[in-house]
Amino acid sequence: MYAWTDGACRGNPGPGGWGVVLRYRGHERTLHGGEPHTTNNRMELTAAIQALEALDRPCVVHLTTDSQYVRKGITEWMAGWKRRGWRTAARKPVLNEDLWRRLDALNQRHEVHWHWVRGHSGHAENEQADALANRGIDEMQEAGAT
């Protein structure tokens, strides 16, 4: 299973969206959504959460994000945060703890291999996830305007 995720925010904080591209054995599924008042980091985390929550059963997932915050958070920083009672090395509360806890549980359910790609560098699936994240914002705003 392959997943590409992206988050977007217009203003930070501001309206935000998330996008996911899932691919398995030649089949592709896309997901997207938006929130009226959020941050870019929350949308990046939400995209990864939505990708993993969409999977019906535990599996091996190669998840690619353009967010170092997400990749490093889950692969490097998480163990220390948990050891310190969800505090950073500076003893401050971990931002977005609610989402990190959800992502941690999903990361334990699946065998996730975390990959990073530079955003807006022409990587096709990352660009698709970015377009979906922006569609999430657009559709949310259009729905609110009617």
UniProtKB/Swiss-Prot annotation:
The keyword Zinc-finger does not apply. Residues 1-138 form the RNase H type-1 domain. Binds 1 Mg(2+) ion per subunit. May bind a second metal ion at a regulatory site, or after substrate binding. Its main location: cytoplasm. The keyword Transferase does not apply. It comes from the Bacteria. It is found in: Cytoplasm. GO terms for biological process: DNA replication, removal of RNA primer. Its EC number is 3.1.26.4. Keywords: Cytoplasm, Endonuclease, Hydrolase, Magnesium, Metal-binding, Nuclease. Mg(2+) 1 binds at residues 6, 44, 66. It catalyses: Endonucleolytic cleavage to 5'-phosphomonoester. One of its GO terms (cellular component) is cytoplasm. GO terms for molecular function: magnesium ion binding; nucleic acid binding; RNA-DNA hybrid ribonuclease activity. Disulfide bonds: none annotated. Pfam families: RNase_H. Mg(2+) 2 binds at residues 6, 130. Its cofactor is Mg(2+). Monomer. Endonuclease that specifically degrades the RNA of RNA-DNA hybrids. Belongs to the RNase H family. This is Ribonuclease H. The gene is rnhA.
